[in-house]
């Protein structure tokens, strides 16, 4: 089996980007170690702090954020970083070539129940000149690499550099990420959907109707039965979609009129959309392709509908949109 380093060489990924990806991977090994120790290391539970999103931070949110910050500051290739746990962008190195956006611990509410969590990251080119928030406001099409690390029964890294999606598994004895799936592919059709049904009454009418039709199964207009899955961590739900197909959605809702969207564009939706498109799926807000959005600020939120291409098209048809054409992933 190829190691991650060997794979990056085989794909002719340039040395500086390879170095950055390996730094992210090595840091995820340390995060995996911290997650595994859990209560034994006293890292479970919440703090009294809130992040810029107004969410109470878990202890591991802060620990993993600091681990990634420290590693990226030492890497030498990074110009700046943006994190879910940082109010503002962080300048790293004047000579850095890359910007890194990340969610250090997606699904951290699952930590205390020993369920799936992960790290999501996106790598962008660093523009010339002074580093400001505007430096980061590039569409998802500009991403040079993206991926996630899933901390589950085994630790797995899903990665794209624009050459498909590869899956690596962390060997528990050698501590190396080894290539275990060279070409992840999302089946175009599915009978699985993932959504937080507790918000049903707050959704827009198109999503209400779409889900209602799925629930009708064989007697409804879709004429087949669907199963619902929900992990409550985007990283886990998207991993399932990449592994066996499906549709994942966190749609617009009016539960809190000031926050109609849940997921963050720069370090959740964009990297996941890049992975999904590279694996043959599609990713949309319901009204526009996620990777085509020009961000307005680093913590911008969007609605997310992604997964099996034909099922995403079916969902979008309820929104009055025809996305039957293949996405442009050049």
UniProtKB/Swiss-Prot annotation:
<feature type="binding site">
    <location>
        <begin position="106"/>
        <end position="109"/>
    </location>
    <ligand>
        <name>substrate</name>
    </ligand>
</feature>
<feature type="binding site">
    <location>
        <position position="105"/>
    </location>
    <ligand>
        <name>Mg(2+) 1</name>
    </ligand>
</feature>
<dbReference type="InterPro" id="IPR028343">
    <property type="entry name" value="FBPtase"/>
</dbReference>
<dbReference type="GO" id="GO:0006000">
    <property type="term" value="P:fructose metabolic process"/>
</dbReference>
<feature type="binding site">
    <location>
        <position position="103"/>
    </location>
    <ligand>
        <name>Mg(2+) 2</name>
    </ligand>
</feature>
<comment type="pathway">
    <text>Carbohydrate biosynthesis; gluconeogenesis.</text>
</comment>
<dbReference type="GO" id="GO:0006002">
    <property type="term" value="P:fructose 6-phosphate metabolic process"/>
</dbReference>
<dbReference type="InterPro" id="IPR044015">
    <property type="entry name" value="FBPase_C_dom"/>
</dbReference>
<dbReference type="GO" id="GO:0042132">
    <property type="term" value="F:fructose 1,6-bisphosphate 1-phosphatase activity"/>
</dbReference>
<feature type="binding site">
    <location>
        <position position="84"/>
    </location>
    <ligand>
        <name>Mg(2+) 1</name>
    </ligand>
</feature>
<feature type="binding site">
    <location>
        <position position="262"/>
    </location>
    <ligand>
        <name>substrate</name>
    </ligand>
</feature>
<dbReference type="Pfam" id="PF00316">
    <property type="entry name" value="FBPase"/>
</dbReference>
<keyword id="KW-0378">Hydrolase</keyword>
<dbReference type="GO" id="GO:0005986">
    <property type="term" value="P:sucrose biosynthetic process"/>
</dbReference>
<keyword id="KW-0460">Magnesium</keyword>
<dbReference type="InterPro" id="IPR000146">
    <property type="entry name" value="FBPase_class-1"/>
</dbReference>
<feature type="binding site">
    <location>
        <position position="268"/>
    </location>
    <ligand>
        <name>Mg(2+) 2</name>
    </ligand>
</feature>
<protein>
    <recommendedName>
        <fullName>Fructose-1,6-bisphosphatase class 1</fullName>
        <ecNumber>3.1.3.11</ecNumber>
    </recommendedName>
</protein>
<dbReference type="InterPro" id="IPR033391">
    <property type="entry name" value="FBPase_N"/>
</dbReference>
<dbReference type="GO" id="GO:0005829">
    <property type="term" value="C:cytosol"/>
</dbReference>
<dbReference type="GO" id="GO:0006094">
    <property type="term" value="P:gluconeogenesis"/>
</dbReference>
<dbReference type="GO" id="GO:0030388">
    <property type="term" value="P:fructose 1,6-bisphosphate metabolic process"/>
</dbReference>
<feature type="binding site">
    <location>
        <position position="196"/>
    </location>
    <ligand>
        <name>substrate</name>
    </ligand>
</feature>
<feature type="binding site">
    <location>
        <position position="103"/>
    </location>
    <ligand>
        <name>Mg(2+) 1</name>
    </ligand>
</feature>
<dbReference type="GO" id="GO:0000287">
    <property type="term" value="F:magnesium ion binding"/>
</dbReference>
<comment type="similarity">
    <text>Belongs to the FBPase class 1 family.</text>
</comment>
<keyword id="KW-0119">Carbohydrate metabolism</keyword>
<keyword id="KW-0479">Metal-binding</keyword>
<dbReference type="Pfam" id="PF18913">
    <property type="entry name" value="FBPase_C"/>
</dbReference>
<keyword id="KW-0963">Cytoplasm</keyword>
<comment type="subunit">
    <text>Homotetramer.</text>
</comment>
<feature type="binding site">
    <location>
        <position position="106"/>
    </location>
    <ligand>
        <name>Mg(2+) 2</name>
    </ligand>
</feature>
């Amino acid at each position: 089996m190829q190691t991650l380093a060997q794979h990056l060489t085989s794909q002719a990924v340039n040395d500086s980007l390879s170095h950055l990806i390996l730094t992210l991977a090595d840091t995820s090994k340390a995060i995996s170690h911290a997650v595994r120790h859990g209560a034994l290391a006293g890292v479970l539970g919440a703090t009294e702090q809130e992040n810029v999103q107004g969410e109470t931070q878990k202890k591991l949110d802060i620990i993993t954020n600091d681990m990634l910050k420290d590693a990226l500051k030492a890497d030498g290739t990074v110009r700046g970083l943006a994190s879910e746990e940082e109010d503002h962008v962080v300048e790293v190195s004047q000579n850095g070539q890359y910007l890194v956006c990340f969610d250090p611990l997606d699904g951290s509410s699952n930590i205390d129940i020993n369920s799936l969590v992960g790290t999501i990251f996106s790598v962008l080119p660093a523009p010339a000149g002074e580093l400001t928030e505007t430096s980061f406001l590039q569409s998802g099409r500009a991403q040079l690499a993206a991926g996630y690390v899933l901390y589950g029964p085994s630790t797995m890294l899903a990665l794209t550099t624009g050459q498909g999606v590869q899956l690596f598994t962390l060997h528990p004895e050698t501590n190396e990420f080894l290539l275990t799936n060279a070409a992840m592919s999302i089946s175009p059709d599915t009978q699985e959907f993932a959504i937080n049904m507790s918000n049903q009454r707050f959704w827009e009418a198109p999503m209400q109707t779409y889900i209602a039709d799925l629930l009708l199964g064989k007697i409804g207009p879709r004429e087949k039965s669907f199963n619902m899955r929900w992990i409550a961590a985007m990283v886990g739900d998207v991993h399932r979609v990449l592994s066996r197909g499906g549709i994942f959605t966190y749609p617009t809702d009016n539960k809190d009129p000031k926050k109609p969207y849940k997921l963050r564009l720069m370090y959740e939706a964009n990297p996941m959309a890049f992975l999904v498109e590279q694996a043959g799926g599609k990713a949309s807000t319901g009204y526009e392709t996620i990777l085509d959005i020009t961000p307005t600020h680093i913590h911008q939120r969007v609605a997310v509908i992604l997964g099996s291409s034909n099922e995403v098209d079916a969902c979008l048809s309820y929104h009055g949109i025809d996305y039957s054409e293949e996405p442009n992933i050049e």
